[in-house]
Amino acid sequence: MVGSLESDQTLSMATLIEKLDILSDDFDPTAVVTEPLPPPVTNGIGADKGGGGGEREMVLGRNIHTTSLAVTEPEVNDEFTGDKEAYMASVLARYRKTLVERTKNHLGYPYNLDFDYGALGQLQHFSINNLGDPFIESNYGVHSRPFEVGVLDWFARLWEIERDDYWGYITNCGTEGNLHGILVGREMFPDGILYASRESHYSVFKAARMYRMECEKVDTLMSGEIDCDDLRKKLLANKDKPAILNVNIGTTVKGAVDDLDLVIKTLEECGFSHDRFYIHCDGALFGLMMPFVKRAPKVTFNKPIGSVSVSGHKFVGCPMPCGVQITRMEHIKVLSSNVEYLASRDATIMGSRNGHAPLFLWYTLNRKGYKGFQKEVQKCLRNAHYLKDRLREAGISAMLNELSSTVVFERPKDEEFVRRWQLACQGDIAHVVVMPSVTIEKLDNFLKDLVKHRLIWYEDGSQPPCLASEVGTNNCICPAHK
């Protein structure tokens, strides 16, 4: 076994170049290959509760080992020949071409791919690490804390909390914001029960498992919004324990916004005083969009919430995953501890934190400002309505929640089509998330491709699935609900 590994790692440069030549025309590590897809696994979506055969099969993504790029040892004379450098440059050039092509057909995930951070290229030569508390400088001097705190202050103003009353940090992703917010709630109420709607992001239930929390999954309305009648029943059944709630400011699949005011009212009517509940608002995508919609309800610390998190790589358009988590200063004491090694305090989830992300966020917040984001939000909502209307005109069931840019429609029958357009699917539905980088032209290309393929999928006379149970009868235009 060891011998085979060594032989793999000592491939001659001639062999590498030969392989590169073979790949030169169609090198695409992310393309859908013609080889059979991996075997399906059952995920239970749509399962028959009576034990019948109603389970839906989920197709996993292909094994990346089929397209992995080997790491090989440089040859002794490589510094003179430069073959290895030329090989790597060619691979990277082709990979860049792949990224350009894949970006053209990106629709299903909430990432804004329209950005230009060329001005920050000069800072990529530094190992910038914001370990520890953002507000206290550590012994490690290569950091970007002034930029990070500037970004945090901007979000504090957005969510209406005074500088001296909040604590927060720039996270490595949206999930970390949820993990931190729920952890603060758990530390405040060690015996508290976590309540989250069934359509909450999977990271919320991951947090419950990690922290060994009792968790109640609350039913949702057709829109995907939390059902406060079901929440009331579950709260009344557990009145003896504090409540820790996850409130969705945009659910993952349907883009539904939980009614924060109704959630608070339900808690109060069930006898939970403000010192017996903690609310974390998962605003991964819409937490930054809603403040710029005039008719949208406010997410604000003027209400009895404990924390808000938002992703930085989604609507903002940061090129690396990151996020912002803000909580009340009075709450963070339950997590904070002194770290002599850093000469600082720490209440974050991670140790080392990406010091480049604050630079990108600071740069784009300064360039766009409130007015710039407002224009982009209006564009996204307008284009989302355009897509929904065109789908309905084409005879395709579609739903768009108010305040949302997530358009839900019937799941395409062909997994290759799903992968080509990078659609997110669940059960019989798929969705497109309209971001600032999604243009009318891109939507028209998608619609044209979808309509063309549907003619093929249903040419045998079969009918598209009824989506009434997923999107409601008003949005379903299957033969039974036209």
UniProtKB/Swiss-Prot annotation:
Induction: By nickel and manganese ions.
Reported phenotype of the disruption mutant: Dwarf plants with necrosis along the edges of the leaves, multiple inflorescences and sterile flowers.
GO biological process, one term: carboxylic acid metabolic process
Molecular function (Gene Ontology), one example: serine decarboxylase activity
Coiled coil: none
Annotated tissue distribution: Expressed in roots, leaves, flowers and siliques.
Subcellular localization, as worded in the UniProt entry: Cytoplasm, Cytosol
Superkingdom of source: Eukaryota
Misc: The mutant phenotype can be rescue by exogenous application of ethanolamine.
Subunit structure of this chain's protein: Homotetramer.
Family annotation (NCBIfam families): PRK02769.1 (NF002748)
Protein name from the UniProt record: Serine decarboxylase
